[in-house]
């Protein structure tokens, strides 16, 4: 049952959607006539922005609806398998910049998390925020204990009820869409909302972001290509994150990078190497690598170092996903479309009864024109996009982990080519993928497997004679038990056979006595019946053994 507050919010959402003419998204279909009639008969609201494109109207509507919808639009901008370019491009322009809330209020919430006055632990706290977004706000300070510059990231007050209310309405809408439009079920709208809810709630937990940052920092410890700021978990909590303050050039500021003498070619190639290292070596990748979260160090511009912030959203791939992904990319660039089709079936991404020949032909038809371009002009992200779009026609369900990966790959690829338009992603990535595959399935993989098990066998080897003796002894005892069970079983079978024999003789004698008695023979029937009863008793006794 919808509550009054939910109804009020739902009315606001519908009002904004109609004011921006978003009912134009509804297809011409008998099932959509009612929603279109509602605009005219119930709300009397006209499209107030007919001069703007549909994509721009969608972006403006989401901005007006607030932070939950802005972030949802940002996530949807990466789903180019669902939206055409003119929609996805507009969604990508959504900026997660909102009016800052009062610095004194931010300080109060920080002190609640810290358990005391902020001056106890920090000096030079600046009440003017360094940055403000829909989920959190950032202020600068220095640590009292050592004078290190830090930033304090605090969750916006009262943001959770707003998020929960809007997510609940999103679920209602997703269920309606799935019910009204059966063809939308393959897109799994309810699961898309569920994935978004998880992502959003993860971002509300500052300790989760701290843990992700610590993991990524450890993975690239002493790396010359990627730096992750230090987290100060002693001062952090669910609502507050304290981290090292960094100085760098925002990656989208091309002019500043050039002015600093940055080696743009190496910087772009490092971006690709960092991404594939995270995915294939670590199985743990930063999945929110938009320009606002990525900086470049001022130091050593000839060997530039990336700086990664905001690890609230990360992705992981299991061993099978990594292998199928690597094999797919290698098969693509060798134009082995049969292999691509077989990999999709083997992985379970498409149904097992898929016609391989038809699937191969569909992939070839879509992807062969792509490879007519020079390799340096081919987009990895768009190759995956075309593949997923084709596979959807063969009932491939959305794979959330692959969507997150595709989004990140598009970010990395876009950044790399923005920095250095001649970036050849294939030349950079191919050696990495081939080396990784050889280590997974080649002779080196066998050596690595033996090496990984060596400590275990080294520990167990001294115990081997004792384990062998115990095994033989237990085997002997087991054989004795089996022999005894077999003897008991055979004895039981013999007893049951003897019992059936006695019952048969007894029954025969009783029947004979009955026949004789009916013929007025008196002595013999009595003796026959007595013998029959005796045989029955013998049979009953045999059954009990």
Swiss-Prot record:
The chain crosses the membrane at residues 498-517, 521-540. Its main location: membrane. Residues 124-502 form the Protein kinase domain. GO terms for molecular function: ATP binding; protein kinase activity. Keywords: ATP-binding, Cell inner membrane, Cell membrane, Kinase, Membrane, Nucleotide-binding, Transferase, Transmembrane, Transmembrane helix, Ubiquinone biosynthesis. The keyword Transferase applies. It is an enzyme of class 2 (transferase). It holds the Pfam family ABC1. It comes from the Bacteria. Pathway: Cofactor biosynthesis; ubiquinone biosynthesis [regulation]. ATP binds at residues 130-138, 153. One of its GO terms (biological process) is ubiquinone biosynthetic process. GO terms for cellular component: plasma membrane. Its EC number is 2.7.-.-. The active site is at residue 288. It is a multi-pass membrane protein. It is found in: Cell inner membrane. HAMAP family: UbiB (MF_00414). Belongs to the ABC1 family. UbiB subfamily. Is probably a protein kinase regulator of UbiI activity which is involved in aerobic coenzyme Q (ubiquinone) biosynthesis. This is Probable protein kinase UbiB.
């Amino acid at each position: 049952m919808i509550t009054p507050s939910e109804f009020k919010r739902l009315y606001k959402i519908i009002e904004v959607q109609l004011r921006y003419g978003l009912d134009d998204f509804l297809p011409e279909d008998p099932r959509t006539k009612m929603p279109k009639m509602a605009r005219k008969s119930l709300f009397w609201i006209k499209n107030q922005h007919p001069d703007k494109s549909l994509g721009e109207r969608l972006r403006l509507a989401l901005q007006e609806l607030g932070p939950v919808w802005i972030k949802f639009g940002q996530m949807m901008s990466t789903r180019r398998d669902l939206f055409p370019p003119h929609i996805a491009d507009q969604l990508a322009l959504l900026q997660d910049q909102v009016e800052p809330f009062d610095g004194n209020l931010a300080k109060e919430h920080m002190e609640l998390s810290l358990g005391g006055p902020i001056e106890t632990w920090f000096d030079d706290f600046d009440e003017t925020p360094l940055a403000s977004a829909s989920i959190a706000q950032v202020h600068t300070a220095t640590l009292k204990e050592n004078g290190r510059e830090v930033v304090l990231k605090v969750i916006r007050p009262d943001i959770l009820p707003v998020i929960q209310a809007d997510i609940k309405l999103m679920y209602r809408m997703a269920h309606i869409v799935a019910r009204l439009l059966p063809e939308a079920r393959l897109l799994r709208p309810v699961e898309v909302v569920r994935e978004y809810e998880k992502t959003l709630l993860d971002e509300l937990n500052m300790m989760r972001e701290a843990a992700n940052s610590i993991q990524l920092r450890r993975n690239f410890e002493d790396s010359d290509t990627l730096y992750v700021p230090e987290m100060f978990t002693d001062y952090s909590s669910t609502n507050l994150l304290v981290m090292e303050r960094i100085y760098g050039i925002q990656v989208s500021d091309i002019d500043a990078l050039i002015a600093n003498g940055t080696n743009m070619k190496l910087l772009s190639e490092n971006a690709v190497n960092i991404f594939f290292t995270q995915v294939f070596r670590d199985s743990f990748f930063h999945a929110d690598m938009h320009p606002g979260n990525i900086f470049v160090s001022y130091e050593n511009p000839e060997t530039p170092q990336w700086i990664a912030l905001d690890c609230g959203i990360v992705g992981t791939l299991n061993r099978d996903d990594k292998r199928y992904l690597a094999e797919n990319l290698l098969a693509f660039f060798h134009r082995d479309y049969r292999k691509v089709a077989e990999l999709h079936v083997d992985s379970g991404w498409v149904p097992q009864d898929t016609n391989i020949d038809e699937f191969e032909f569909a992939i070839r038809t879509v992807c062969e024109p792509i490879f007519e371009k020079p390799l340096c002009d081919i987009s990895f992200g768009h190759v995956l996009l075309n593949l997923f779009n084709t596979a959807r026609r063969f009932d491939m369900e959305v794979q959330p982990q692959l969507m997150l990966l595709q989004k990140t790959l598009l970010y990395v690829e876009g950044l790399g080519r923005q920095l250095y338009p001649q970036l050849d992603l294939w030349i950079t990535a191919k050696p990495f993928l081939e080396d990784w595959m050889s280590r997974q399935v080649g002779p080196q993989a066998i050596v690595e497997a033996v090496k990984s098990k060596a400590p275990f066998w080294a520990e167990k080897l001294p115990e081997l004679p004792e384990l062998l003796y115990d095994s033989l002894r237990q085997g002997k005892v087991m054989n004795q038990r089996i022999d005894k069970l077999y003897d008991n079983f055979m004895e039981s079978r013999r007893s049951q056979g003897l019992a059936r024999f006695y019952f048969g003789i007894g029954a025969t004698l009783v029947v004979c006595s009955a026949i004789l008695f009916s013929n007025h023979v008196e002595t013999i029937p009595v003796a026959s019946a007595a013998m029959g009863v005796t045989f029955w008793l013998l049979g009953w006794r045999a059954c009990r053994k």
